[in-house]
Regions:
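Positively charged N-terminal leader segments that act as targeting/secretion signals
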Residues: 13-15
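Carbohydrate-binding surfaces of carbohydrate-active enzymes
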Residues: 17, 37-42, 50-58, 70-71, ...
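Generic start-of-chain signal for non-secretory N-termini
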Residues: 17-47
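Structured loops at beta-to-helix junctions and adjacent beta-edge loops in soluble globular domains
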Residues: 48, 154-157, 164, 170, ...
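Short coil-to-beta-strand
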Residues: 65-70, 175-190, 258-265, 269
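Catalytic and substrate-binding clefts that recognize carbohydrates or anionic sugar/phosphate headgroups
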Residues: 118-223
Length: 513
């Protein structure tokens, strides 16, 4: 009797365990299916010609046939329709309608070309919002100008400055001294910004104007589609220069130190000191200003309007380029719902950047990490190289690929705009299956565990103090000497050079990566 009772209890327990296992397997399968849909590739759809309804609808159906999950609508070189004009919004309306019909997600992009934040060059036309930098000119004789920041004298030898002293107007030099003239240089108008200017992305008023003329315009036209048909918005390559309006007042308010008295430390090793507290404070302040002026308000605007915020910053390749262009990549992308990065070409091995971005995603509690990939790889980029480039990123935590890019047209200079093209202009587009494979690979990375590090500690402070003179990257030898991980930088450069040689000489289509 006791044996029978034990046997019955064992059978019940076994059935319960089997039920739980089946339920767990079913839940995992359902989770995997959901992730495959959300992790499918999203190409940059380059609007670079005269936009016409029938052609827009045709190309969206091609994206569906290729297995993509959606697309980023991206104004690019060659656009013959007025950006943010009446025809632009009509083309968007057509594209959103067709995407809804075929089950794709149309994502917005916040700029004409890139980098985000200049409003097609319009914002910088207000000189208060214009990009600027702090510069130094070394002269043998004094040259005093009324609009300069400050003047110094000192004994200069290469990057070493000894016995610097601040000068007043009309002061003479002593024997052996050089004259250092510090001034602000404003960005010039250029064709890339349609005859306008790059904006100052550390200026909160400039970025409020950017949101008003771009984001609010989209909300007025398509706000009812936000969060449903239109899932989110892409920001591309925001970055900061070395100066902003009232920088000296902001610096003193933040640190209690008069910045103008210490300008030489931004450019030179003063009295033999490689490290400078002023240099560290300046790099840190630039990162804080970019974050508070750009990342925070755009992120808050997106959440208020039901949009996911994604994209990447400029110069995330390593800590040297990050210090120069943003101060800190991780501080910026932590405000994104889907943190991202840009892996240019098919042999740029920026492992640190991928690990940093994946670490931010984990800290934010999300599994989605976006990579804009393959820009500049050339028209001859083979499928096996694309697979290899995606696989190592999956292993380190990337789950969604923004494939660069799908040309609307190849007319004129558009064909030279950072190929390859992955849409119907490429002979292998029907065989590529990048969208479907991207969904499976991304889902595996999202549901499983990557080979990457769970947490990345960004040790940027030393580089802020040692290697960020004028917010610029130091010479290669200095960068390798002063930056943490200098040996890894050298190894990566050798791998990069080897990759270039491999792709010039490739003759092995069966290469397994």
């Amino acid at each position: 009797k006791n044996l029978n009772c034990c046997f019955i209890q064992w059978k019940k327990k076994r059935r319960m365990l089997e039920y739980r296992r089946q339920r767990t397997d079913k839940e995992k399968e359902e989770q995997m299916t959901r992730q495959i849909i959300t992790c499918r590739g999203l190409p940059f759809w380059s609007w670079n010609g005269k936009l016409e309804e029938n052609e827009l609808r045709r190309q969206i159906r091609i994206f569906r046939e290729m297995g993509f999950g959606g697309f980023f609508i991206h104004a690019r070189t060659g656009l013959a329709t007025d950006y943010l004009g009446k025809e632009w919004f009509e083309a968007l309306r057509v594209s959103i309608d067709e995407a809804r019909k075929v089950g794709l997600q149309p994502w917005l992009y916040d700029e004409d070309r890139y980098a985000s934040g200049s409003g097609a060059g319009e914002i910088g036309k207000n000189i208060h919002f214009r990009r600027r930098s702090v510069e130094v000119k070394v002269l043998k004789e004094p040259e005093y100008r009324t609009d300069d920041l400050a003047w110094f004298a000192g004994k200069l030898s290469g990057t070493m400055l000894a016995e610097p002293r601040r000068l007043e107007t009309g002061a003479d030099l002593r024997p052996g001294e050089s004259f250092l003239r510090f001034y602000v240089k404003f960005a010039e108008a250029d064709s890339w910004n349609n005859g306008g200017y790059y904006s100052d992305m550390m200026n909160p008023d400039a970025m409020r104007e950017f949101i008003r003329m771009t984001h609010e315009h989209y909300a007025a036209e398509f706000g009812e589609e936000f969060g449903s048909v239109i899932p989110g918005l892409f920001t591309d390559e925001p970055n900061c220069s070395t100066w902003t309006e009232n920088m000296e007042q902001k610096f003193e308010a933040r640190y209690g130190v008069p910045l103008l008295d210490h300008l030489p430390e931004l450019f030179f090793e003063v009295d033999g000191c490689e490290c400078s507290k002023i240099r560290w404070q300046m790099a840190n302040l630039r990162a804080e200003l970019l974050e508070s002026a750009f990342a925070v308000p755009v992120s808050e605007w997106c959440r208020k309007h039901g949009l996911l915020y994604t994209g990447h910053v400029f110069g995330e390749e390593n800590t040297v380029t990050q210090t120069k262009n943003t101060g800190s990549v991780m501080r910026f992308v932590r405000h994104m719902d889907i943190p991202g990065l840009d892996v240019l070409s098919d042999h740029q091995l920026i492992y640190e950047a991928v690990l940093q971005t994946a670490s931010v995603a984990r800290q934010n509690g999300t599994s989605r990490v976006l990579s804009e990939s393959f820009a500049g790889s050339g028209w001859d980029l083979p499928l096996f190289a694309q697979k290899a480039g995606m696989d190592w990123q999956y292993a380190l935590g990337v789950t969604v690929f923004c494939v660069h890019h799908a040309f609307y047209t190849l007319r004129g200079e558009a064909k030279r705009d950072f190929p390859p093209g992955i849409s119907f202009q490429s002979p292998y587009w029907k065989q590529a299956g990048g969208g479907r494979r991207g969904g499976r690979g991304g889902a595996s990375a999202a549901c499983g565990s990557s080979a990457g590090i769970d947490l990345v500690l960004e040790a940027s402070g030393r580089l802020f103090a040692e290697g960020s003179r004028d917010g610029d990257a130091p010479p290669a030898a200095s960068a390798q000497r002063s930056a943490p991980g200098g040996d890894r930088i050298r190894l990566r450069r050798r791998a990069y050079d080897g990759g270039k040689r491999f792709h010039r000489e490739r003759a092995a289509p069966d290469w397994k990566g």
